[in-house]
Amino acid sequence: MTRACATQVQQHAAPTWGQVPIPVVYAASEQEAPPGAWVIAILDDPDQADALGWHTEEQGDLIYGRVFAAPVLDNGGAVLSGALTVSGVLSHEVLETLVDPHVNLWADNGNGDAYALEIGDPVESDSYEIVVHGTGPVGVSNFVTPHWFDPRAGKDQKFDWLGKVTAPFRMTKGGYVVVTREGKIQQHFGETYPEWRRAMKHADTSRSARRTTT
């Protein structure tokens, strides 16, 4: 799944966002990770209740994240292939770390509201597969483009990688957004957003919790 995430960053997300395509590599343990690397570990069970995947800052401005397999598998998901996968959660975390590693960027919608720069959340329940040689298809997360955060973007623009969203600041039925409105931070869920995922958005270590408590 690391190779699928690397391909997604290099060929899809980084070019779309005008970012340098940072390497995504596998390490058997944190100790074997390259010096200075931002580590996203895949673990079986959450070390904090209701945490699906999160990343945060450690000392020295390094980013440290975790993805937990059990919540995905316990709710009908799979490891690599399907609509809900551990690889998709990893992809989601990698993508959002790429674009907003410090979880502090917001975009103004032109009407006084500010939307969190979380590129996976608005289309969180949508995924696609990348074929990895020797492994087969691996699920990765859909993500929104810079046009999604631009209130002046026209309807002819591409707002997400899979083309499911038709206007800026809109989410799919299985999406989620964090919005600052009149000085208050709010969370909005799509009509089919799973209840088990909602609880995880409130986990103390989630990106969403960091948004809503700062």
Residue ranges and their predicted role:
Residues 1-24:
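Zn2+-dependent metallopeptidase catalytic core
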Residues 9, 13, 51-57:
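Broad hydrophobic/π-residue packing in well-ordered secondary structure
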Residues 9-17, 93-94, 98, 102:
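Sec/Tat-exported extracytoplasmic proteins
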Residues 23-55:
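Short, well-ordered secondary-structure micro-motifs within conserved domains or adaptor modules
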Residues 47-48, 55-63, 69-80, 84, ...:
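Metalloprotease/metallohydrolase-associated module, dominated by Zn2+-dependent proteases
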Residues 82-95:
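Short alpha-helix carrying the canonical HExxH Zn2+-binding catalytic motif
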